[in-house]
């Protein structure tokens, strides 16, 4: 039996990322933890991030029009959680959370050295949706820790140790279940 509830954000899980953005004027570079992030286009490669207008980082992204999406490891949970709770208006999150800012190649926002994947982005569109603004951003550079790539340059996902966000809780990712298209191939069918 199904139980109907009021409309909610029940699309689960969502990734856990650290978005870094360059400071504006006298403000320091900042980090915000986000879970409402997703791939939206493959050519050109684009992603989306949703940020509440009340957040300090929202103002910085509006000014900079670029940012870096950094993928943290599960072992960084405490710093990840604090980056999402503390305000950059009151905390120097890079210094206080022990993160190292490294220059990006294409944008002014810094990479977080301790994160194994860094995705440089330039905002192409912004939509005011209600509680959140949605930024659609083109990916202009992607960086991987070398040990995460196999000899063919493919991601060794099992070694990434990424996190997911589900209903107010952080979760680790489980085991590999299969590959895209494997069921159709096994059944002798094509799309």
For each predicted feature, which ranges?
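Basic, polyanion-binding surface patches
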Residues: 1-191
